[in-house]
């Protein structure tokens, strides 16, 4: 076999090897692209979901601070208020049509953000009043201002239907424009969220 023939044979073999390798690489690339599509479909969205269980001023306040901060950063934010957290959403107290236990709960629970106490050092409401004075002096937005800001920024606010039923809270007692939903509503939001918090 002459040198020319050897060179031609080598070139043909290299061409076959290169074609096989290119074909194998193309298949691997297709598989990787398919996996990437699948993974990107499973990634959480740019959103945060919070359960607001507490009805304490010093816990509801951070919920609204986080929600407005997230909304300002372009994230979708949702707050799911349940049990004692529902007190923050009350605009009035309505005893009509309620049973004895529901009336007792209604009388013992605060109405609205103004009535929320502190989780520590509340001292029959004095602690909460002092906290509000300090916040005003330090030019920190009040809970009421943050709640209004959150609504204006499109933060989704949901009241837990089951908790409303248990505590005897009527839809008419809560802020206008909020949603009422069950645990499925929260779970649907949380499943798509980057962050989920329990406050």
Regions of interest found by a model, annotated:
Residues 4-45:
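Long, leucine- and charge-enriched amphipathic alpha-helices
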Residues 50-61, 134-135:
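Short, glycine-rich nucleotide/cofactor-binding loops
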Residues 61-79:
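Histidine-anchored nucleotide/phosphate-binding helix
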Residues 77-83, 158-161:
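Short internal beta-strands
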Residues 89-98:
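Glycine-rich loop at the start of a catalytic domain that most often binds anionic cofactors/ligands
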Residues 97-135, 139:
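A glycine-rich helix N-cap at a beta->alpha junction
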Residues 145-153, 158:
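A short aromatic-anchored loop/beta-hairpin motif
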Residues 159, 164, 172-175, 179-199:
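Glycine-rich, aromatic-bearing surface loops/beta-hairpins
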């Amino acid at each position: 076999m002459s040198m020319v023939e050897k060179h031609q044979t080598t070139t043909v073999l290299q061409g076959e090897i290169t074609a096989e390798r290119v074909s194998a690489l193309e298949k691997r690339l297709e598989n990787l692209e398919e996996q990437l599509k699948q993974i990107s479909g499973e990634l959480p969205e740019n959103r945060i979901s919070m359960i607001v269980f507490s009805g304490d001023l010093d816990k509801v306040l951070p919920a609204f601070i986080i929600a407005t901060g997230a909304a300002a950063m372009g994230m979708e934010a949702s707050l799911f208020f349940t049990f004692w957290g529902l007190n923050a959403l009350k605009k009035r107290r309505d005893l009509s049509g309620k049973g004895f236990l529901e009336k007792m709960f209604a009388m013992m629970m605060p109405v609205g953000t103004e009535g929320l106490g502190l989780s520590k050092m509340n001292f029959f409401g004095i602690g909460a009043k002092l906290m509000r004075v300090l916040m005003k002096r330090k030019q920190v937005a009040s809970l009421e201002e943050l709640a209004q800001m959150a609504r204006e920024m499109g933060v989704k606010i949901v009241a837990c239907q089951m908790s409303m039923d248990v505590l005897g809270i009527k839809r008419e007692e809560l802020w206008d424009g909020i949603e009422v939903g069950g645990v499925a509503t929260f779970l649907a939001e949380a499943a798509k969220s980057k962050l989920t918090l329990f406050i």
